[in-house]
Amino acid sequence: MRLKPSFRWSIYAAFAVLFLTGAGWLVADWQKESSIGETWQQTAAYLLMVHGGAAMATLLLLGALIPLHALRAWRAAQNRISGSVMATFNAVLIVTAFGLYYLGSETLRPWMSWIHIAAGCLLALWFPVHIVLGRRKLR
């Protein structure tokens, strides 16, 4: 199911901002013990704020994507496996983001963090696959 260009590019932009700020935060977090750790810590804080804001916008886009794209494609039996993988990665990211933000458990936090990072990286790899598979089936 092809999306209107403005909506499609909004989704691409939102996912790009999420991936870049998430990856940037990861680098900044790893560097906070360095000699200029304070700079990295401040950078990590700013990146996390942008990441959270982009996540809010992405949630709105995903909410619109369900009836406009996912449900229509599902009913037409198009790209079901690839779309299900996309939905699963997004659901894992939403649940783990909620856990990271709202759960105070120091036992669960490292697990949530690593699952969130892994799901984000895997989604970034799978997203272009989903697009290519969908376009091949439209031809």
Language model features: what each stretch is:
Residues 1-139:
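Membrane-embedded alpha-helical bundles that constitute the cytochrome b-like, heme-associated redox core
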